[in-house]
Every structure is written in C-alpha cells, then in structure tokens.
Amino acid sequence: MSKITSSTLLKFKQEGKKFTALTAYDASFASAFDSEGIDVLLVGDSMGMVLQGHDDTLPVTVEDIAYHTRCVRRGIKRSLLIADMPFMSYATSEQAMTNATALMQAGANMVKLEGGHWLLDTISKLTERGIPVCAHLGLTPQSVHVFGGFKVQGRDSDNAQRILDEAKAIEAAGAQLLVVECIPAPLAKTISEALTIPVIGIGAGADTDGQILVMHDVLGISSGYIPRFSKNYLKQTGEIREAIRAYIDEVAQGIFPGSDHTFN
C-alpha cells in the first residue's frame, strides 16, 4: 500500500472518503494498526494519562514524545505519523521551532499544536521552514485548568463563532490538518465544510473528514473515566486486529460515531 501523506488525506476529503486515526506509543501496536489500515497515527500527550498514570497531559515532556515517536516510527510502513507538541513546548515561536525539529528528527511527519489565534505566527513560521502542522481546537487538554475540567466547548453562539473563526485563520496560516475535540456535531460539520484542509474529529460527530480515538479506549483497557465519545471495539470483536478493522469499517460507513458518542 502507498504511504499516507497530507496530500492523500486531502484527496480523501475531496472524494468524501472518511479516514481513521489512532494514538500509538510503541512499535508493536503501531505495526498492527498500520498493517490493518489505520491512516494516521498520533503519538499523543495522552500518554501522560494512559501510560504514565497522571490526571492530565501536562507532565509529558518533549523527550517523552520523541522517545515514543522513535518507537512508533520503527513499526510502521504506511500510516502518516503525527507527534504531539506537549505543554509549554511551543510557548514561543523559537521554542516551537527547536522542539518541533526534535520531533521531526525522531520520525514524525507532522507535529500537532493546541490553540487558536495566538498560534498563527508559530504555525506560519513552522510551515515556512518545512515542518507540517496539525492544529487542535475545541477541548484542548493542555488548557484543562483554564476550562475548569474536560468540558464540551463551543455550545454557545459566541464560542462557536470563535472556534470557527480560529479554524479558518489556522488554515490560512498554513496548517495542513485540524483536530476538533468535544464540540457540538453541527459546529464540527460547519467547520469541516468551511475548510479545504481535512478535519479530524474526536467527540465531534460523524461529519468530520476523519475520526481519531485513543487506542486504550478502542481496546477497552483505559482505567478510570471513560469518555462518552469513545467505543470499546475489542469487547464486540474479541481480537485486537478485528477490533481495529471494525473501527475502520464503522467510520467508513458512517456508523461511528453515533448519537451516543456525540454532543449537540
């Protein structure tokens, strides 16, 4: 199979083909996800919670992400690999450049940053220097203490308009992908239709161009709180590779996410 690139995902969007993404942190799981057809793998700062046992993502370091990016890179042949920029690793454009370079050298194809208007200059500088950017709007977990918890964003008209405006500005700044997390499905649909670049949803309804989940949720091995937007595919299939295929098939057919996994 041909390698997935940002151009591939753009073509999928133009053709109306839904694509799938998962988090991954090691070579073995990454290889399984890659070979079963997951299009995008994210070395997420979610590792702070699902691997390291923290209450949030804030303790994760650039070194943590780089280590796991190298591990995942060794396990994949096809999937596009995105690495999260962890908390405060891109507070300035100079920091962003240094840390994004380290993650690209670790094997990432793209880096992901959380935030809106304040990031526009950083996004432009990274893309101008050959570092592709995936942006992240809505519930941005690194800002959990500002939000007062893991809460749905964009439910009132003012915040919905702000998120839409930020999405358009981020695209204009040069971002090649956008993740929207925990926003009302109608808002996610509006954003996906308004942008040329592909939009990946998590807890954002079925009308985004792609879907992403945390691998621990898909495999039913998360401890503690289970997000409403997640689905345990291993429970219904009994085998890891079958679970991944079921996830891919349900996204392609528009079955997942259903109303039980969506906010309005």
From Swiss-Prot:
Molecular function GO terms recorded: 3-methyl-2-oxobutanoate hydroxymethyltransferase activity; magnesium ion binding
Membrane-traversing stretches: none
Needed cofactors: Mg(2+)
Listed EC numbers: 2.1.2.11
Matching Pfam families: Pantoate_transf (PF02548)
Encoding gene (name): panB
Residues given in the record as 3-methyl-2-oxobutanoate binding sites: D45, S46, D84, K112
Disulfide bonds: none
GO cellular component, one term: cytoplasm
Reactions mediated catalytically: 3-methyl-2-oxobutanoate + (6R)-5,10-methylene-5,6,7,8-tetrahydrofolate + H2O = 2-dehydropantoate + (6S)-5,6,7,8-tetrahydrofolate
Quaternary structure and partners: Homodecamer; pentamer of dimers.
Active site: E181
Keyword annotations: Cytoplasm, Magnesium, Metal-binding, Pantothenate biosynthesis, Transferase
GO BP term, pick one: pantothenate biosynthetic process
Its biological purpose: Catalyzes the reversible reaction in which hydroxymethyl group from 5,10-methylenetetrahydrofolate is transferred onto alpha-ketoisovalerate to form ketopantoate.
The name this protein goes by in its record: 3-methyl-2-oxobutanoate hydroxymethyltransferase
Entry's localization field: Cytoplasm
UniProt pathway annotation: Cofactor biosynthesis; (R)-pantothenate biosynthesis; (R)-pantoate from 3-methyl-2-oxobutanoate: step 1/2
Superkingdom assignment: Bacteria
Family: Belongs to the PanB family.
Residues annotated to bind Mg(2+): D45, D84, E114
InterPro entries, A to Z: Pantoate_hydroxy_MeTrfase, Pyrv/PenolPyrv_kinase-like_dom, Pyrv_kinase-like_dom_sf
Primary enzyme class: transferase
Cofactor remark: Binds 1 Mg(2+) ion per subunit.
